Every structure is written in structure tokens, then in C-alpha cells.
Amino acid sequence: MVATEPSGTGAPRFEKKGILRFVEDSETVLARMDRSTLEYFSSLSKYREAYGPYLDRIGMPSGKYLWQLPESGESFSFEARSLDIFALHDPYFQYEIVKLPEGFCIRTGINVPQFDLPGGARQVQILAGDFVLTASECVQLGILVGKGQG
């Protein structure tokens, strides 16, 4: 935010020019993913065949954003995930996706640039109908287990 002094008031005024510029959902963006890259999987085996069994997360398990973790174990960079600077020291988790119940699906796509970061990571979300689940909910439902525990 930029502080300026409105004429004659002597008090600073803040313009809405904050450093964090979130990319909102639009015709081209959904949940920070490029809509042209979105894929939906109702079959776990087809998802795993395309992208492997592992996911990871930067942030508490109460969050809904996961990322593909290549089988090599080399995770996407912070910059490719286009996360805001406040997530820099958040905890890191690795998961294996082991089941996908009937009526659930996996949505995946490529992160768009934001916060002056390039994007490009493959983001993954688990949906129950139209409802996006948190990592914690996925663990409780047996969809995800800690990597190496499955």
C-alpha cells in the first residue's frame, strides 16, 4: 500500500495498491490454474498413469491446494507454485493418493503466474462433487496417506 497525504487533512491515506495481487477466477483462470490446462479424473488409475501417485503441499493440512510430486521426488519450486511470500516458511508435506471414492474426482491444471512469480507447477485438487477437499479431509477419508506409509 502507498501512503499519501490527502490535501489539507494532514493524515495519511492508503491506496489499494498492495504488494499481493491475487489472480481471481475468471474465464481463463480457476483456482489459480489456467483453465485451458484443466483435466478431470474420476478414475484413480488413469490419474496415476498420467501423473504418478504422489502429491505434496506447502502449508497446513487445512488447505485445499496440492501439487503433483514427480516420482523422482523433485518437487516443484516455490516460484512455479506462485505462492505468496507469506507461505515461504510454511510446513511441507508429501502424500500418496491411494483411493478415490465413487462420486469424487481429481482436478489438475497448471498454475498461472502471480505475485511476480512465473507459475508452471501442476496443481491438484480432490473434489467431492463440486466441493474441494482439504488435505486433512483427504487423509481422514483415506484418499491420501503420508508418502511411504501406503
Regions found by a protein language model. Name each.
Residues 5-150:
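Catalytic toxin/effector domains delivered as secreted proteins or via bacterial secretion systems
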